[in-house]
Amino acid sequence: MRLAVISSVSMIFGLLVAGTGNASAADICTGYGPQTPRDITSISGTNKRLFTLAPATAELNLCNIHTHTNAEHKGPGFSVFAGKGPHGGYKCNDSDMLTAAELKDPTNGKGAFQGIKPGDTIEVHWVHSSCDIKPGKGLGSCLSQKCANPQLRVETQVFLVVNDKNALNFADFTYGGNMKNGLHQAKSLPSGTGTPVVFAGSTTGPKYTQAKCSPLQVTWSVRPQCAKVHVGSLYKWAKDGNVFQEDHSHGVRQLVTAQELLSPIR
């Protein structure tokens, strides 16, 4: 029995860790639950494999924080297409309206957090789990041998990275050992960027496509507008070290558009 549990955890861990992969849009996977990312302005979807949405973050443990360069989702504030593939996705609508000062990289390309620079769009994921775990490296930290099938909830904010100390400080949204009511929690979550769109979906990352679907069930909460974040605060997060061992931004999964792979948004 113990070997079976370890095998199950190993399999799920492998499914959670994002890799790279190519798929033909003509080949739609079948038999899977709803997939992510999506256009959050469209509420339609015909996937019938519904599941109970995860509780609010206050009832779950924060298990991981990571970023993707360019938004994986498409939304009202991030609708500028950035291309196909793992380096595609969507950009904040104001990306082309930044000043020269906002676009200046204070490290001249040598920032500690790799894969971003001023002017880039990033999508940040605060991943929460119903398991009794501690935050750590990779999404595998969201489960354990004793909790191999957790309820997962991802809080999401898309940021426009700028060189401006008056912009948001990423440190305000990190972990730093913060506990509340016995649960691991982010210091805070972004506000003022619209009511989050909540829906049933899956894990993301460039490993998956419409032909290669993720089997995991994830509740998503995606804020619809971009916010500016100071690039220096992201560099500092990596330079100082973080429990997630995040030192670079990840690639994206291309938008899921097939109705049979999307849940209806209530």
Give the positions of each predicted feature.
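Short N-terminal edge-element motif at the start of the domain
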Residues: P34-I133
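Bacterial N-terminal signal peptides that target proteins for export
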Residues: M1-V9
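Long, compositionally biased interface segments
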Residues: T203-R266
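Non-catalytic macromolecular-recognition regions in eukaryotic signaling proteins
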Residues: A56-T57, N61, H66, K146-N149, ...
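Boundary at the C-terminal end of the N-terminal hydrophobic targeting segment
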Residues: A23-A26, G31
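C-terminal segment of classical bacterial N-terminal signal peptides
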Residues: F13-A23
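Short helix-loop boundary/capping segments
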Residues: S130-K207
